[in-house]
A protein has these predicted regions:
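N-terminal accessory beta-strand-rich subdomains and adjacent acidic, glycine-rich linkers
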Residues: 22-196, 202, 565-571, 578-585, ...
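Active-site mouth loops of central-metabolism enzymes
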Residues: 218-229, 322-336, 458-464
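Aromatic- and carboxylate-enriched substrate-binding clefts and catalytic-loop regions
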Residues: 249-454
C-alpha cells in the first residue's frame, strides 16, 4: 500500500506522521473489451461509484466521484485488455499514417475541448469494427489509447483522467462506451461521435446553408500581404466561378509581413491596406459574396498596445509566436474578446469569423492561478472558461445575425466546438491532396451536422487541366475552399473549377449532407462514398481499386480521382449504359456495363453517371430470402 508522509506543527513542535494513501480498484466483468478495471492510487477524500449501463448491444460504464467539499479531483484510470484477434489497425480523428496499432510503451494520446476527441476505433482490414471506444469527457484533458502489448499480443486500452491541473470541484461523472459490434467501421465511429455529444449534453449550434457554400481564402497566396484592391479583384473572378464567400486571413491588422503574431491583440485594421474596411466589405457583398475575417483568439502580441492592459491576465508567454496567451478565466478578458468581434461585425458588416488558435488556451507547466488562489477569476477551470468564452462569443454574434458563419480547424473539432462553430476545416496541408482527403474524411465521421471544409486548394498554373482537377476531386466530400491567384490561371483551369463547383453545389445534399462511408482508412481512404435517397456518389483514389456500385436503385456517380484513365467497377445488377464525362464535365461518350467486375474507360479526372432505366424494377424479397426481379 502506498504511504504518504505528512509534516505539521503542534504547539511549536514539528511532527511527522506517516499515513496510508487510500487506493480504489474495481472491475466490470465481461464487456466486449474483456474485464474493465477502474483504479485510483490515492482517492484522498473522494468516493467512487462505478456502474455498468448497457444499451443496444453496447457496453457503457458510468464512473462517479464525490467529495464532502471542493477539492482537486484525483487521477484515475479505466483500463482493459483482450487478445488481438482480427484487430489490425487503429483509427483516431487524427489518423493519417496508415492507422498503425502501436506498442503500449508509446501510444497514449490525449484530447480536450480544443484538441480532438476521446474516440478510437480498432478495425480489421475488411472495413469491420472490432472495438470502438469513446468517453463522455469533451472539455477536460483525457489521455487514452488502444495499443499492443508485445509480450503476449494482448490489446491494451483505456482512459486516464485528471492528468493535467484541474480546479477544485465537489463531484464528477464520466461515461465510457465500448462497442464491439460487427458492423462497418465508419458507421461505428459516427455513432460513437454522436454519443459523445449526447452523453456530454452538448447541443450543436445552427448550421446555415451558407456554411456549405464554396469559398475563396486569402491565406496561401497572399499570406499577410493583403489589401482591399487585391482582394476585390480576386473576388470578382471568384464570384463568376461560383464561389460564394471570402475569408480574409492574417495581415489585415498589421503592415508587417514577417509572419508571427507579434502585432495581434489590438485588432485595428491597417489603414494602408484597408482605408475603408466597411466600404470594402460592401463592394465584396455587391459581387454576391459573404465576408469572413480571421482572428487569433488568445494572442496578444509583444508589439500590441493591449499587452500592458492585460498584464497579469495571461496563461503564459508563447515566445515562438511572439505573443502572450490570454487567460479566459478573467471576466474582463472574455468581455474584451466578445466585444471585439461584435464591434467588427457591426462596423464592417461581416458575415462570419475564422477563429484560430483556441488550442493555445492551455497551461505551459503549472496553473498560474493556484499560487494566486484564483484571484480575479470568476471561473476556476480553464476548459470551462474556454467553453464559456466561446459560448458567449457565439451568443453575441448570433444575436446580431442568426446565420453567422464561424470556422474552426482541426484539431479543435470535437462536440464542444460544435456548440459555437458551424464550419470545420481540415488543418493546413498545402498542395497535399491525399492528406486533405484523409482529414476531410476524418472530419466527416465526427462532425455531426456541421459543414466540413477542405483545406484550401492550390496548384501550379502550368499543370494540365486534368492535373488541376485531381486535388478538387480529392476534396469533393467537403466544402471546397480555394486559395490561389485566380487571375494567373489559364482558361482551361478556370473551366475545370467552374464545372466542379457547379457539380459540388448541384449534388451538395448528397456529397456534404448524405450518409457518408469511408473505406480502408489503413490505406488512406482509396474509396469514399456518400448517399442520399436520390443518388450515390463514389470517389475512387487508388489505381485498380474495385468500386462496389451497390444496388441499382438510384443514380450512381463514379469520380475518377486517380491519374489513370480507367476504373474497375463491381456492378451488381444486370446491364446498364453509363455516360462518360471528362475533367471539365464535357460528354465523352458512353460505356456498356454488365453484371460483375469489369474495367471501363474513364477519362483522367473525369466521371461516370449510371442512371437506372425507366422500366427498372426494384427487387422484392420473399419468404426465405429468394430474390425475384
Amino acid at each position: 500500500m502506498k504511504m504518504k508522509v505528512c509534516t505539521f506543527a503542534v504547539s511549536g513542535l514539528m511532527l511527522t506522521l506517516t499515513v496510508c494513501a487510500a487506493p480504489f480498484e474495481t472491475k466490470v466483468v465481461g464487456t466486449c473489451a474483456g474485464d474493465v478495471r477502474v483504479a485510483c492510487k490515492d482517492t484522498r477524500d473522494w468516493v467512487f461509484d462505478v456502474q455498468r449501463v448497457d444499451a443496444d448491444g453496447v457496453d457503457e460504464i458510468a464512473v462517479r466521484l464525490s467529495a464532502a467539499k471542493d477539492a482537486p479531483p484525483p487521477r484515475f484510470e479505466v483500463l482493459f485488455e483482450f487478445p488481438q484477434i482480427r484487430m489490425n489497425h487503429v483509427w483516431t480523428d487524427g489518423s493519417t499514417d496508415g492507422n498503425r496499432l502501436g506498442p503500449d510503451w508509446r501510444s497514449w494520446q490525449w484530447s480536450d475541448i480544443a484538441h480532438g476527441q476521446p474516440l478510437a476505433c480498432l478495425h480489421d482490414g475488411d472495413n469491420r469494427n472490432r472495438l470502438t471506444m469513446a468517453c463522455s469527457e469533451a472539455l477536460r484533458k483525457v489521455e487514452w489509447r488502444i495499443a499492443l502489448r508485445e509480450e503476449n499480443c494482448m490489446v491494451v486500452g483505456g482512459f486516464r483522467f485528471f492528468c493535467a491541473p484541474e480546479a477544485p470541484v465537489r463531484e464528477y461523472e464520466v461515461r465510457i462506451r465500448l462497442d464491439g459490434r460487427d458492423m462497418f467501421w465508419s458507421d461505428a465511429v459516427q455513432e460513437a461521435a454522436a454519443w459523445i455529444a449526447r452523453a456530454a449534453k452538448l447541443m450543436s449550434c445552427r448550421v446555415p446553408e451558407a456554411a456549405y457554400n464554396p469559398l475563396y481564402s486569402t491565406w496561401y497566396q497572399f499570406h499577410q500581404n493583403v489589401s482591399a484592391n487585391e482582394i476585390e479583384a480576386e473576388c470578382a473572378i471568384a464570384a463568376k466561378m461560383g464561389m460564394k464567400t471570402v475569408i480574409l486571413d492574417d495581415g489585415w491588422q498589421t503592415d508587417n509581413n514577417n509572419r508571427g503574431y507579434a502585432f495581434c491583440g489590438d485588432w485595428n485594421v491597417s489603414p494602408r491596406r484597408f482605408p475603408d474596411m466597411a466600404a470594402h466589405v460592401r463592394r465584396v457583398h455587391e459581387l454576391g459574396m459573404k465576408y469572413m475575417v480571421w482572428y487569433s483568439v488568445p494572442f496578444v502580441g509583444r508589439n500590441s498596445k493591449n499587452r500592458e492592459r492585460f498584464k497579469g491576465k495571461y496563461l503564459f508567454e508563447y515566445k515562438q509566436h511572439g505573443a502572450w496567451v490570454l487567460d479566459p478565466r478573467f471576466p474582463e478578458v472574455r468581455k474584451f474578446l466578445v466585444d471585439t468581434y461584435v464591434a467588427a461585425m457591426k462596423e464592417w458588416g461581416l458575415d462570419g469569423f475564422k477563429l484560430d488558435f483556441i488550442d493555445s488556451f492551455r497551461f505551459n507547466g503549472k496553473d498560474p492561478a493556484v499560487a494566486e488562489d484564483y484571484a480575479g477569476r470568476d471561473i476556476r477551470s480553464l476548459p470551462d472558461a474556454v467553453n464559456r468564452l466561446m459560448m458567449d462569443v457565439y451568443a453575441a454574434l448570433s444575436a446580431e445575425n442568426p446565420d453567422v458563419l464561424i470556422e474552426f480547424r482541426q484539431k479543435y473539432i470535437g462536440p464542444a466546438i460544435r456548440q459555437f462553430g458551424n464550419m470545420m476545416r481540415a488543418t493546413d496541408c498545402p498542395g497535399d491532396m491525399q492528406l486533405n482527403r484523409q482529414r476531410i474524411a476524418n472530419l466527416r465521421l465526427t462532425s455531426g451536422g456541421a459543414a466540413v471544409h477542405a483545406d484550401m486548394l492550390e496548384w501550379h498554373p502550368t499543370d494540365t487541366p486534368e492535373g488541376a482537377a485531381l486535388p478538387i476531386l480529392s476534396s469533393m466530400f467537403g466544402v471546397i475552399q480555394y486559395s490561389m491567384m485566380l487571375r494567373d490561371l489559364p482558361e482551361s483551369h478556370r473551366e475545370v473549377i467552374r464545372h466542379w463547383l457547379a457539380f459540388s453545389q448541384a449534388h451538395r445534399d448528397t456529397l456534404l449532407k448524405g450518409h457518408f462511408r469511408a473505406y480502408h482508412p489503413e490505406s488512406q481512404y482509396p474509396l469514399l462514398e456518400a448517399e442520399s435517397e436520390a443518388e450515390r456518389i463514389i470517389g475512387v483514389y487508388a489505381a485498380g481499386q474495385v468500386v462496389p456500385c451497390g444496388a441499382f436503385d438510384r443514380t450512381v456517380y463514379v469520380l475518377n480521382g486517380v491519374s489513370g484513365d480507367s476504373a474497375v467497377l463491381d456492378f451488381a445488377d444486370g446491364t446498364a449504359t453509363a455516360e462518360v464525362f471528362d475533367a471539365a464535365g464535357k460528354a465523352a461518350g458512353t460505356v456498356k456495363l454488365c453484371r460483375g467486375v469489369q474495367r471501363v474507360a474513364v477519362p483522367r479526372s473525369g466521371y461516370l453517371r449510371i442512371v437506372p432505366p425507366a422500366d427498372y424494377c426494384l427487387c422484392k424479397r420473399f419468404g426465405d430470402g429468394e430474390v425475384q426481379p
